[in-house]
């Protein structure tokens, strides 16, 4: 039934949605149409304002002919289409109407059911009122409110529905008429257009016949319009009256309800306050109240469902109205056909009316004005109605909310309340939306009526148009004013319509949404019901399984504990006899509560034990690792052997214990599969315990855990069973409610279908019996549960004892563990000490190694210095008389340094000796440790052999996991290596740069301070070296510590993670096994949840792993960076040392050349300053000249200015290019950095992806397992399905048989009851004639009908769905009847045939008798023969008698059968009578419809009469306008009278309805009686429940008493057991002593194992440290070897250099002896030069001041020049003889693209374009070859081939690392070789001599480049500001010095050949300062 109702609800929801959608679309169309009408009205009026209408009418005549023909064609086409559509529609509409009638019958049934439900609601409310005290008030209020709502609403809704039906019918009519209007308007527009076009033509001569025809058509159309308008006006007046009445009722009701609700709100608030204050006082009473409120809320839920049903009923009513509307439409169609006939007749008259058509137009204008006014009024009224409706909806919603809030005391019921509120709100919204739509439709109707009135008025005035024309012309002016007003009103109306449209659309959208939500909710409800059913089935299955399991458990427990059970069984038997039926349920409840409490405690204990086990396992794993490590390093073999023996003994004992425990486990394994899984884990644990004591501990814990789990499972099962019982009870109650509902429905439908009701009743009885059976079974289950519970109690008691023992054992073990921990802590402390000593050793060793290194280096330095000293001494001895004082100073300084170094060396040697002693001691201790480790290794190898056999199972699992981890690690390492390589590359680059920069900075510093090296400098260097050494040491230590930390972290983390993964894998395997074995859906779900949780955990673990790996990699990279930095610093140190040596050597030689260089440099600087001054002065002159020329001659200046502009532009372009290049460079840098970042990110992503891949693989494996499980379940389902299919086939077969029997029976019945059939035939005949009458009525436009048909189809489909379910039920019943009748008929036929056979036999026998009589007469003489014959005859007679008796018996049987058949026939007659009642109901409905039709016809007649009255009124108006008002008043009065009549008729209809309702109430009373019966049965149920509760209470009391007795008996038993114990004490004492010994041995073993573990730990730690030290040592050795090789190479190179230098010096010494005298002279000269230099510097200062002044002048001139340039620019634009810039640019670019041989031709071309003569060009080329100035090429940065004339330095590149002193020497040299000074650029353009940019850039230039530079630039290019390399991004045009405040424009400077540039070459790293110095020396 629930599914049927659900289907009905969903169908209704869909139909509602469709109806809403169609209504929305219709209203939208109407609103759009009204807008269009208004717009067109204005256009018409505006078009028809001019007075020249007569001319238009004349022009129209000609056009109307052609137009008339077109209209005729259109009419014919439309008629054909119309006929075709009518033929189609007739068939469809008949079928739909039949179906609608069926639906209406169903609706009546549903209404009856609704009334019954309402009665039930009232009852429930009365029950709710009996709630005591606090809850009483809200309950009563709620009930009262509900009753109120029920009393008021249905009637109102009914009225609404009636009106709604009328609206729908009128809406359809409106749509049709609106289409007609639009068509007519389009025609009017067409005519107007034609009239406008043909105004100019003016066709006066038109045929009179055409005009007449058109006039006829117009008249006919106007008549139609007037009729329709009258009809609609009447309908509208009726509707308005009804609406006004409704509005008043609604407003009154709304006010009343509001006041009620306000009062209720106040009451509820007071109650809430009271409830809040007295919470603490009345807890018990409140609980009771809460229960009551729960019941009330459930009742309210039922009520809400009823409300839903009511709404569904209303929807059905609306469907009814639709059908009535269709009838109206059919009538209208018929009318239309008649009108069409009339139209054809009137077509002839149309010609006469053509002239009058134009005269009617002003009247149309008037009517449009009146129409707009009416529309405005109606819109206002509609808006008022809308407001009222909305208020009502709101009030209803508020009422619902208030009612729910009154029952909101219990927080747990808040959710139900919310749901109810939501549903009610949704329903209210739907209601309000429907009302809005209705009102909108009414508005549209009114508007259309007005329009039709306009058309009607025009039609009626056709007769008196001539007379009105004159009056209308007079009134035109007045009307024009009114027109303006109407236009403004119309605009407002349009706005209102738009707003209404928008509101309507929103409402429709909302309605659709609500319907979707309702349908979704229904679907969800259905799904929930199905799920609950499935759950019930599953729970039942589980109960059976649990019962089986419990039986097994009880059997096993009986076997174990027979003695206790026997003693308890005797007691139980005594008590069970008294307490079987009464105490079971209560006892179960109490025990279950206890079990739940114990469950909770056991769960807690389990959790604690699990944690304990986990800790133990972690300890075990740690100890195992330590053992494995310590196996390689154990000592004390003798002591260990003894320990081993003890341990083996211990292990044997433990094995015995374990065997006993395993037996227990095997018994427990039978209990459940879950327990088996845990036992398997235990077995594994036990195996571990055989080898290690800690594992034994874990095993014991697991045993206790398993026992707890068994207990927990039993308790859980009990809890579940109890829950299932409760649930079953609830389900029974729910089902009882459902059945009650079904009974009510059946009772409603009884009058219609008595046979169906009887069958339903039987079905219900069967169901009740089934339920009783189920209840009995459940009672049995409860009994079984009782017994089970008692047994489980025994089990629990035994398990508790075992637990106690286990806890004692655990305590002992914990004591042992504590002792072991203490020992381990001591060992740990010792280990820490050793590790500290080792660290100290390591540090000392490192220091010693470093000292050794430093010593070696110092020795080598010493040797070198000694050699140098010897050499210097020799030189001094040779050149004693001419020795320098500086050389002597340096010698003394070196000697003092040597002495200091010797002292340092001695100190270092002493330290080394001390450290060596320490290292030897440590080595000895290490050797001892190693020996002990080796001994331990031997012992541990033996142990390992034993372990390997035992751990075979474990190792396999671990190996698999290890392989996975290894693969991961490999991938991680690969990635790390890649990362490391990339980072190393980056770091090496960075280090190179770092080194270079450092070296450069150091070189600069050294260069600057070379000329006064002293003691302080050497000391500073030594200190720096020491500091660097210290830094290196610190960094090394840091690196070592970091590497250690990293290794430790990685090892620990990997270990932990692997352990966690192993645990998780084990758990997953267990779960998989469980999934594969168990078929319980709940278990599967639980396991799936666990799986998900584990997957989450695993993901987290992987995430942690990834993070740790990242950290590792990060730390490693940092370590590598640190190493690189250290290496860089060391390299820098070595370079510094080398440079110091070189400087010391060089300083001695270069001392004498210094003076010369300084003098030369100073003189050169002075010359350069002079040159600059000259250049500036020339520039000033040129500027002045330019200014003069610009001011005087414009013509001459044109070309110059052009050139000037072009050059400036080119400069700007080049600047832009340079900027672009710089930007590009920056972009490239940024992209490189981005690429680096991206690479890092990608690597991280790679790691993440790998981790994800692993996770995915795991998930895949899990999914595969799940998939296999699902496949199995799927196969099972398939088998079930097949079985079901077979059953279905059987059922179908039986149904088919039944159908056959039914057919036969029906045939019989036709013969038996022809009267019935004739009666039944009458109804279909009447229906057919009705259909025929209706089919005649069908005549409307095909498009609208098709749309409506589609809607009807949809509604029919939905209704079909509901009817099908009912039909199926009917079919079943009819099938069963048919089957029985068939069987009876067959039997009857058989009996008939048998009777016939018997009759035939009788005839034969009679004939035989006659023959025998004749024989007797003939042979009477022969006595003998006659006697013999007689005897035979007697025998034959006896046989015949037997046959006759048989026949009689058969006849009796047949009579019985006939009686049965008669009874069945009577039943069938009864069913037919029921059907007759149904047919009568149908006939009544038909009668109603016919009544409706008659009413409609009457209305039509009234409308026609009205029309006539109006026509008379109009005629009277034409005669005289004075009597119009009176006539109108009379008409109004007549209308009112008619409305009164109609209302009376309506009241009569209502009375008839009330009679029907009375009949319904009679039916309801019957239903009420049935309900009373049900109520009594419910009371009986309640009584039985109370009785049960009482019996349970008594049972609990007796159970308690029984427990007390049990306790007493147990005490007696304990006394007996104590006696037994005393007898067995001797045995126990002996065993106790043995156990004590065993425990002592165990303690010893534990102590020994702890010691061993601790030593193993220490060993492992030390091993790790040793490994780390070895690694670091290896690294350091590698580094050392590398350094040594480098140093050797350096030393060899140095030696060779020194040898060469010595040879050179020897030669030089000989030369120098000769030159000493000349040098003294040179010295004198140098002194003189220095004096001159000082003078030159003074001069330089003066010159610089002059230069500054000139610069200022220059700037001023520059400003003037800029102004002049601007003027020139303006002149250049106007001046002639311009050079084509594009051509010049192309030539210029071409010049550089052409090969060097052909460049002269390009230049000649340029010259010819610029107007340079050939002679001048040749001269220029000649000058260019000869080295004359060529500023353009230099300026553009082209490679200059010519040598510039500026004095240059000997080597450009050597300046880089040179100090000021060096530069000074070079300057002196250059001064000694003077050259002609060329004109110079500005001082700002000069780069300073020692600018760092230049230095840096030139350091790395290769020698080859230097040579080329020298060859090109001669001596000195440094001064040139244009020689800045391109790599520095210096613009070629704007030199470094040129700023915004720089000197004048480049073009104004003298054209000089000082602008050569060099393409930058890549710097080579091997270019050191030494090479530069060598070059210097060579030059």
Curated annotation (Swiss-Prot):
Lineage: Eukaryota, Metazoa, Chordata, Craniata, Vertebrata
Molecular function in Gene Ontology: small GTPase binding; transcription coactivator activity
PROSITE patterns attached to this UniProt entry: GRIP
InterPro entries on file: GRIP_dom (IPR000237)
Compositional bias segments (type: Basic and acidic residues): 1898-1918
Transmembrane segments: none
Known disease link: A chromosomal aberration involving TRIP11 may be a cause of acute myelogenous leukemia. Translocation t(5;14)(q33;q32) with PDGFRB. The fusion protein may be involved in clonal evolution of leukemia and eosinophilia.
Chain segments carrying region Amphipathic lipid-packing sensor required for tethering of intra-Golgi vesicles: 2-38
Species per Swiss-Prot/TrEMBL record: Homo sapiens (Human)
Residues the UniProt record annotates as site (Breakpoint for translocation to form TRIP11-PDGFRB): 1754-1755
Protein name as catalogued: Thyroid receptor-interacting protein 11
UniProt record, GO biological process: cartilage development; chondrocyte differentiation involved in endochondral bone morphogenesis; endoplasmic reticulum to Golgi vesicle-mediated transport; Golgi organization; Golgi ribbon formation; inner ear receptor cell stereocilium organization; protein glycosylation; protein transmembrane transport
